[in-house]
């Protein structure tokens, strides 16, 4: 009977867990719909901003303007990279499958790749899970912020990027890369690595799919070339981080929805197996009692 009580307790415990994971799945599904819409709208703006850059750079190139003084712009092929800053974005919470682990693995892989080329790497972290991992393993993270990935905010992203841009313009780093998990569809997330500084004539190809058409910007900007580029570059860099945060959040909700759906299904299977074990143990207990009764009756004859 003790075994039966234990199995009943396990069944009750698993059913309670199943209710929790199912509720979390519903919450993540609801949040995902909202995050997906925001990400879709933000991506449209990001692609438009990319188109502006690409058009301005094309016009300057066609006009023979090669000596761009703006420090935001460099040709990566001609630039000797000695120092790289990696901005990584992870979630503040867990229970989202391999979402955080995949991002961390990519950060470590990129770090090793750069270091093998004698390139110094500095990390800047957004997201509690990633920051905790690197802190636990004794890996220095220059800037840490823990509640921005779960609540993307343009002003805070702008503030975070100020120090990054300042270090870049002052020559403390030669290249800035963002690594995060991106939303592809309801069931697929993909790791994205994007170079945001320096900016070269590669923006459209780096950020969009071949099927995504870009509009040509026909308006003529006023002001010097460097002033125009500096103004656009500042907006581009800030929005690149903001969009990455939005994209990462949508991917996080997608991953958590899948993880909770899997956990719920596993709980159902476990309850089914435990119920079979319970019924089998109950039948064995009844059979044992009947045998004992029959043995007692035979002994009295």
UniProtKB/Swiss-Prot annotation:
Mode of membrane association: Peripheral membrane protein
Pfam family, one: ATP-synt
InterPro entries: ATP_synth_F1_ATPase_gsu, ATP_synth_F1_gsu
Main location: membrane
Key words of the record: ATP synthesis, Cell inner membrane, Cell membrane, CF(1), Hydrogen ion transport, Ion transport, Membrane, Transport
Gene Ontology biological-process annotations: proton motive force-driven plasma membrane ATP synthesis
Any coiled-coil regions, as ranges: none
Keyword field contains Transport: yes
GO molecular function: ATP binding; proton-transporting ATP synthase activity, rotational mechanism
GO cellular component assignments: plasma membrane; proton-transporting ATP synthase complex
Function comment: Produces ATP from ADP in the presence of a proton gradient across the membrane. The gamma chain is believed to be important in regulating ATPase activity and the flow of protons through the CF(0) complex.
Quaternary structure (record): F-type ATPases have 2 components, CF(1) - the catalytic core - and CF(0) - the membrane proton channel. CF(1) has five subunits: alpha(3), beta(3), gamma(1), delta(1), epsilon(1). CF(0) has three main subunits: a, b and c.
Protein name: ATP synthase gamma chain
UniProt source species: Helicobacter acinonychis (strain Sheeba)
Gene assigned in the entry: atpG
């Amino acid at each position: 009977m003790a075994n039966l009580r234990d199995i009943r307790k396990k069944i009750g415990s698993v059913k309670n867990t199943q209710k929790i994971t199912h509720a979390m799945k519903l919450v993540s599904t609801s949040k995902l719909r909202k995050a997906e819409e925001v990400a879709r709208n933000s991506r449209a703006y990001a692609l438009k901003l990319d188109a502006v850059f690409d058009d301005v750079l094309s016009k300057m190139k066609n006009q023979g303007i090669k000596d761009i003084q703006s420090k935001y712009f460099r040709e990566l092929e001609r630039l000797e990279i000695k120092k790289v800053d990696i901005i990584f974005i992870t979630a503040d919470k867990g229970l989202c499958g391999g979402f955080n682990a995949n991002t961390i693995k990519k950060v470590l892989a990129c770090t090793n790749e750069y270091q093998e080329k004698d390139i110094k790497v500095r990390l800047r972290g957004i997201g509690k899970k990633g920051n905790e991992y690197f802190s636990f393993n004794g890996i220095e993270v220059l800037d840490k912020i823990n509640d921005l990935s779960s609540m993307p905010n343009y002003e805070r992203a702008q503030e975070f990027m100020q120090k990054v841009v300042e270090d870049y313009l002052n020559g403390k780093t030669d290249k800035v890369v963002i690594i995060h998990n991106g939303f592809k569809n309801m069931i697929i997330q993909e790791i994205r690595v994007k170079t945001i500084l320096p900016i070269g004539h590669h923006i459209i190809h780096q950020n969009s799919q071949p099927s995504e058409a870009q509009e040509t910007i026909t308006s003529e900007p006023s002001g010097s070339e460097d002033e125009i580029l500096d103004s656009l570059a500042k907006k581009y860099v800030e929005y690149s981080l903001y969009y990455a945060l939005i994209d990462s959040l949508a991917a996080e909700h997608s991953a958590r929805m899948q993880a909770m759906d899997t956990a719920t299904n596993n709980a159902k299977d476990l309850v089914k197996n435990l119920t079979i074990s319970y019924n089998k143990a109950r039948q064995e207990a009844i059979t044992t009692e009947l045998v004992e009764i029959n043995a007692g009756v035979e002994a009295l004859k």
